[in-house]
């Protein structure tokens, strides 16, 4: 009897495993693809996004690869899977991965203080460790206002400006998203390896994984399939603003990537190359503060538990580009998109895409309320616009209001 039950369980287990294996890498369903098409086209129309590149993967295998719109509006070049976009801050996960490869080789420790590599840092930096920089718990903030993004600083000049910036809190005591923290990590990688951090990424991550178009940004170089970035100015589409080559070479998110490059990256995160299981566990663990509380951020990844799912994600925004990657660690589903418009609402866009697979993530519908007094509403709207433009029709306001506004009655 026990043997028969055991045999039955084995058959059930084998059948379940077969179903799982068939599901992994299976194409997205017709309804899901139609839903994604609808979401992308609605978002592109609403936010005037020229082009989008999108991939859906299960366990590192592409199940849906889509291209929408234009990579370059002026030349009417369509987006394709090989189109290269700017990364924005999703580039931080590659900086973190580079640091972790060095930690795996015992070339540095996450507990090392920055002063070990930069002895002349100010006293406020003395307690900052590599771990603090990775988790945004260093107390460092964003780029100081004195930095001119159009000026071509040397790496030493950048770092000198960083160290003059006051810290916001003691290292490890709180959390504050810090671009200069990740830019500092890039400089540190150079100190440890003797190589520019972008060259180290090429050698240790991009080339081994076959990410053939991934690289540090260079607007001067000839880059095949490069998309143009755009912004809206008073509703009109404009080219991205120019920044200096030095500004586009920092480790806080200055990469070129295609959707195919990111698909290969996602696949690699299911293997021990380049990151071991121990390293992957660390990059997706919440940062623990000195008071014992935690923040939902690992090393270059936001963390969340949502609707029973464990997920990691990050967005990016830079020079007329937006990007997003979200990975469900439990169901092994990944959704990635790259867009060439600053107006892309990347977090809302991502949630709408996720809802194609998990309806519980859908944003709640907004219930409209019937206006019982539309004429009064129209008058109020007109008065508000006048207040905003300083062109006031006195007859819309009571004598007391006119007195407050300084208008003569």
Specify the residue positions occupied by each region the protein language model found.
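N-terminal secretory signal peptides that target proteins for export/translocation
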Residues: 1-10
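Bacterial N-terminal signal peptides
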Residues: 14-25
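Sec/Tat signal peptide C-region and signal peptidase I cleavage site
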Residues: 27-31
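Short, conserved catalytic-motif segment at the N-terminal edge
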Residues: 33-87, 107-112, 155, 164, ...
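Short, surface-exposed loop or secondary-structure junction motifs
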Residues: 70-73, 125-319, 324
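Short, well-ordered beta-strand elements
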Residues: 313, 324-341
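Short, gly/Ser/Thr-rich active-site loops of penicillin-recognizing serine hydrolases
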Residues: 339-406
């Amino acid at each position: 009897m026990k043997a028969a039950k055991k045999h039955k369980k084995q058959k059930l287990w084998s059948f379940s495993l077969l179903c799982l294996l068939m599901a992994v890498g299976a194409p997205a369903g017709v309804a899901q693809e139609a839903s994604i098409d609808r979401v992308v086209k609605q978002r592109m129309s609403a936010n005037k996004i020229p082009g989008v590149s999108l991939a859906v993967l299960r366990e590192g295998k592409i199940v849906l690869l889509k291209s929408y719109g234009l990579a370059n509006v002026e030349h009417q070049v369509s987006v394709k899977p090989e189109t290269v976009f700017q990364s924005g801050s999703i580039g931080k996960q590659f900086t973190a991965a580079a640091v972790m490869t060095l930690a795996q080789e015992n070339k540095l420790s996450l507990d090392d203080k920055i002063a070990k590599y930069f002895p002349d840092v100010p006293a406020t930096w003395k307690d900052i460790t590599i771990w603090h920089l990775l988790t945004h718990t260093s107390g460092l903030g964003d780029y100081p206002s004195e930095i001119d993004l159009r000026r071509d600083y040397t790496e030493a000049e950048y770092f000198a400006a960083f160290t003059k910036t006051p810290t916001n809190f003691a290292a490890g005591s709180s959390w504050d998203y810090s671009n200069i923290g990740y830019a500092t990590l890039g400089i540190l990688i150079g100190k440890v390896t003797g190589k520019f951090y972008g060259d180290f990424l090429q050698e240790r991550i991009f080339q081994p994984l076959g990410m053939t178009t991934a690289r540090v940004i260079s607007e001067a170089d000839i880059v095949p399939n490069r998309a143009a970035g755009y912004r809206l100015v008073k509703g009109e589409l404009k080219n991205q603003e120019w920044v200096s080559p030095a500004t586009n070479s920092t480790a806080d998110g200055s990469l070129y990537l295609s959707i195919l490059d990111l698909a290969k990256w996602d696949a690699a995160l299911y293997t021990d190359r380049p990151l071991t299981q121990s390293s992957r566990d660390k990059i997706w663990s919440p940062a623990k503060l000195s008071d014992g509380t935690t923040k939902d951020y690992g090393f270059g990844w936001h963390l969340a538990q949502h609707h029973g799912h464990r997920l990691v994600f990050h967005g990016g925004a830079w020079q007329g580009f937006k990007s997003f990657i979200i990975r469900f660690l439990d169901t092994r589903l990944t959704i990635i998109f790259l867009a060439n418009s600053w107006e892309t609402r990347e977090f809302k866009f991502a949630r709408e895409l996720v809802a194609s697979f998990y309806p519980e993530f859908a944003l709640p519908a907004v219930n409209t309320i019937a206006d019982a007094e539309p004429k009064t509403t129209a008058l109020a709207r007109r008065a508000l616009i006048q207040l905003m433009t300083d062109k006031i029709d006195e007859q819309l306001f009571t004598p007391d209001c006119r007195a407050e506004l300084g208008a003569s009655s």
